Amino acid sequence: MELRNKKLTHDEFMTERQQVLKTWETGKDVENFEDGVKYQQTIPEHKRFSLALLKADKEGKTLSQPRAGVALMDEHIELLKTLQEECDLLPSTIDAYTRLNRYEEAAVGIKKSIEAGTSKLNGLPVVNHGVAACRRLTETLQKPLQIRHGTPDARLLAEISMASGFTSYEGGGISYNIPYAKRVTLEKSIRDWQYCDRLMGMYEEHGIRINREPFGPLTGTLIPPFISHSIAIIEGLLALEQGVKSITVGYGQVGSLTQDVAAIQSLRELAHEYFQSYGYTDYELSTVFHQWMGGFPEDESKAFAIISWGAAVAGMSGATKVITKSPHEAWGIPTAAANIQGLKASRQMLNMVNEQKFPPCPAVELEIELIKSEVRAVLNKVFELGNGDIARGTVLAFEAGVLDVPFAPAACNAGKILPVRDNTGAIRVLEAGAVPLPKDILDLHHDYVAERARCEGRQPTFQMVVDDINAVSHSKLIGRP
């Protein structure tokens, strides 16, 4: 079947569902869709993700959410019980085997974790644990819960998660393929995520609003805002077509105050612009700001500075929520104590800037207009390639290099675009590849980069890019020689 941005019919969905539920033994727990609906209807309002986001947006507050997940359910429950005292929203980060649908290996990881008395997986294997165990998790905790993962084919995970009482689901057919996988085709991942979104849409039709969040940071490495914005908007459109009504579009901090504030503000405005221009009006929109996703310094004091800076910018830019980091980021998966330190530092800063939204200024306005022009140029070409169909257009756009994510592993990603910082730390385009930015915009990027090159007395080359990638872990933003 040729990929199209068209709502799956009930028969199409149910026929596919029969096969999805057979991919692991716990699929039998969710054969009765109505059972999942009835369980979701028992969840109180204070534990519903979409309501928490809606309330925060109305009140102008920025909510905090960490990342966290371990192999065994009892330990995971204890971890989240500890974290919920310091955050507004809770995660369940999924392990790497589940992300690749390698459930047998996840089962081995559970066994080894039991034997070792500590987690041997980098997340919670929800599919292996099944509905009963996961319902124990959602019933024990008192904050809204979201599944955070990185799964190109997240269909069975979605089924078990929703029937278990999670009320938000991160990811998308682009953002959980291009940065995470090498050999998964976009046709397959987008189609598999149409199933996930249709599942959420079916819950919506039964009065259950599930929040959906495309993954904004992508590779987390020098991502120009227009690239992540374009993909977030595409995934939002794909979700809306399948009946999703609560969308959170995301963005990963780049470190430039002007560009980060402009990015969050333009992301919300552009999402409304495209959603409404394509006929979607009945939806709730929120934004998420991811604290710095690149390399961290090993020194905890320096790490706290990065965490606090991210929280400050998230709050001042008006983001609905911020995904926090820990001072152990350079060392690997953080302990609960380190995670709490990151949450506390973030909350202190969020409280201090709560009434201090970043004021309008010419520099931010110029950056907003630049990002909007770039996104429109890219998305217009994507729609053109697909003859108006955003799903088909996306596949063709990646084939043509029109959509191109820096430093991504996917074979279907051109990898020709090369970003670099300008003299103020904003992310600019050094080499555009086939990304269809207008000449005047490319000239502007060239001028920004040339200004930095003159200041540093060197040519803008790949070495400058490498220096920028390593800069923050070396206590700088710009990779000066």
Curated annotation (Swiss-Prot):
Protein's pathway: Amino-acid degradation; L-glutamate degradation via mesaconate pathway; acetate and pyruvate from L-glutamate: step 1/4
Alphabetical keyword list: Cobalamin, Cobalt, Isomerase
Domain of life, source organism: Bacteria
Binding locations of adenosylcob(III)alamin: G69, N122, P179, F296, K325, E329, I333
GO terms for MF: cobalamin binding; methylaspartate mutase activity
Co-factor(s): adenosylcob(III)alamin
Residues holding L-glutamate: R67, R99, R148, H149, E170, Y176, Y180
Stored SUPFAM superfamilies: Cobalamin (vitamin B12)-dependent enzymes
Cysteine disulfide links: none
Family: Belongs to the methylaspartate mutase GlmE subunit family.
Function noted in UniProt: Catalyzes the carbon skeleton rearrangement of L-glutamate to L-threo-3-methylaspartate ((2S,3S)-3-methylaspartate).
Subunit-structure text: Heterotetramer composed of 2 epsilon subunits (GlmE) and 2 sigma subunits (GlmS). GlmE exists as a homodimer and GlmS as a monomer.
Protein name (Swiss-Prot/TrEMBL): Glutamate mutase epsilon subunit
